[in-house]
Design a protein with these regions (language model features):
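A short acidic Gly-Thr/Ser loop motif
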Residues: 27-33, 112-113, 237-244, 250-253, ...
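Nucleotide/phosphate-binding catalytic cleft detector across ATP-hydrolyzing
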Residues: 1-236, 255, 279-281, 288-330, ...
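A conserved active-site cap/scaffold subdomain adjacent to cofactor or substrate pockets
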Residues: 262-286
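Basic, amphipathic juxtamembrane/active-site segments
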Residues: 43-51, 251-271
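Glycine-rich phosphate-binding loops at beta-strand->alpha-helix junctions
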Residues: 113, 192, 291-294, 356-380
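Hydrophobic, well-ordered secondary-structure elements that form the walls
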Residues: 344, 363, 411
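A general structural motif
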Residues: 336-345
Length: 448
């Protein structure tokens, strides 16, 4: 893992250099769409002591100067499946954003939604020889524990300290200069499939771009869609994309768990296409314009003209004038959405979400906009549920403030104001890359 440590530090330095030059692109590669926004930076901002160790990661103010979205191609379950098609789509979206911004970008930060994420927790503890916590003590405690293997072909995507303790004083965001005898840390580590990560890196390079960072789409969506109190007191963000549904849990303003359900809104569209025998573009139109999950007595009488949007007239009167009731449409959509939510429920149960002090659930992503989803999710998940829109950032167009762009906005926030990661610290050479892990569920229940 020494190579990983150095690679992440290199990307972090590339991000800082791009920000110093003033321009950095954010690239959200999803199953249904690919979005690129170009950020203009005003230089390093003032570090905020309340955000943790903070200065290691570096923070800056920014505004959006270019933005473009196109249909995704070659991506399945949030992972690149057909390299050539995805490359063409990425080139197209980056060129569109560059044209609007009037600048050329060379460095991008990208998101990854699939890749079979797995959460782990780790704990480290050291003795303070000086009786006070210094910068090197923070680095030493992060490298203090031995590590079992993550498994073959796994890569670390995030490794964030979420809690420090000095002697009996726990819940510290920044332990530096605290007086004591022992320093302990809890850290959340998120790993992903290495092949999916390598394919993303290869795609970016084929587009003549340099990768200045990679972030979890579920983590990014949570940063954008959860309000400050939810991130502090505990909440789950459910990012319902086209091919995958990301799950992230936040507590004390840190992500402490992440996973994904390999189902999304595209399956709902496919069910409509097969159930009503209509093309996929017609099924998508029916889902977005007339879809729903809660049937009423009037839905049997509300007829939707399908033939008018299926394509050119065929000459067959019954086909060209075909209609379906909204009740039939809801009857097709609801079982699949229930299946997705059941998968989310299983993930939350495995994470011990019921033990959280606050059990707020925030739905975001494109599929979260289906009418009636919040009510259905409330019954299945058994929690307080709301639909979350991403935070407004300066210069962002209105069409990019919808829930489907939560991960994009969160990735911009992550680029400008990253939380500290393991590789932000100067590790002792002999210990860099040596960290101890426990399964996240056990760690979560024991430490929070």
């Amino acid at each position: 893992m020494r190579d990983l440590y150095q690679a992440q530090r290199t990307m972090r330095q590339m991000r800082r250099n791009a920000m110093a030059r003033g321009v950095l692109a954010v690239l959200d590669i999803g199953t249904s769409k690919i979005t690129c926004i170009i950020l203009q930076f005003d230089g390093p901002g003032q570090f905020r002591d309340t955000d943790g160790v903070g200065p290691m990661a570096g923070q800056s103010s920014f505004r959006v100067i270019g933005q473009f979205t196109t249909q995704s191609r070659g991506v399945r379950y949030g992972e690149i499946d057909t390299m050539g098609e995805t490359e063409r789509a990425v080139r197209h979206v980056v060129q569109g954003a560059q044209k609007q911004a009037g600048v050329r970008v060379d460095h991008v930060i990208a998101s990854i939604a699939g890749a079979r994420p797995a959460s782990y927790g780790l704990a480290g503890e050291i003795t303070l020889t000086a009786g006070k916590v210094g910068e090197q003590d923070v680095a030493a405690v992060l490298a203090a524990c031995d590590a079992p293997d993550f498994g073959r072909g796994r890569e670390v995507l995030h490794a964030q300290p979420v809690n420090f303790a000095v002697d009996a004083r726990s819940g510290l965001g920044d332990p530096r200069d605290h007086v004591g005898n022992r320093l302990a840390v809890d850290m959340h580590v998120l790993t992903i499939d290495g092949t999916a990560a390598s394919n993303l890196v290869q795609c970016i390079r084929r587009c003549d771009l340099e990768l200045a960072g990679v972030g979890s789409a579920a983590y990014a969506a949570g940063r954008a869609a959860l309000v400050e109190d939810e991130q502090e007191l505990g909440a789950a963000c459910i990012d319902m994309g086209g091919g995958i549904t990301g799950v992230s849990i936040f507590l004390k303003k840190h992500m402490i768990f992440a996973d994904a359900v390999r189902m999304g809104g595209d399956l709902v569209t496919r069910d409509i296409s097969q159930g009503l025998r209509v093309p996929m573009h017609t099924a998508e139109w029916l889902k977005t314009r007339h879809g729903g999950l809660e049937a009423t007595g009037r839905d049997d009488m509300e007829m939707i003209a399908v033939g008018a949007v299926s394509g050119p007239e065929t000459g067959d009167w019954e086909t060209d004038r075909r209609t379906v009731s909204r009740a039939d449409l809801i009857g097709i959509m609801r079982p699949r959405v229930e299946e997705i939510l059941d998968g989310v429920r299983a993930v939350l149960d495995a994470a011990g979400f019921d033990h959280m002090p606050s059990r707020q659930v925030v739905l975001t992503g494109g599929a979260s906009q289906i009418p009636g989803l919040d009510a259905l999710a409330g019954r299945i998940l058994g929690q307080n549920v709301r639909i979350g829109r991403p935070l407004r950032i300066q210069g962002l167009a209105q069409q990019h403030t919808a829930p489907c762009h939560a991960a994009t906005v969160g990735l911009a926030l992550h680029a400008a104001n990253p939380q500290d990661e393991w590789w932000d610290f100067e590790m002792p050479v002999e210990r860099a890359g040596v960290i101890g892990l426990k399964r996240a569920v056990r760690w979560f229940r024991n430490n929070w």
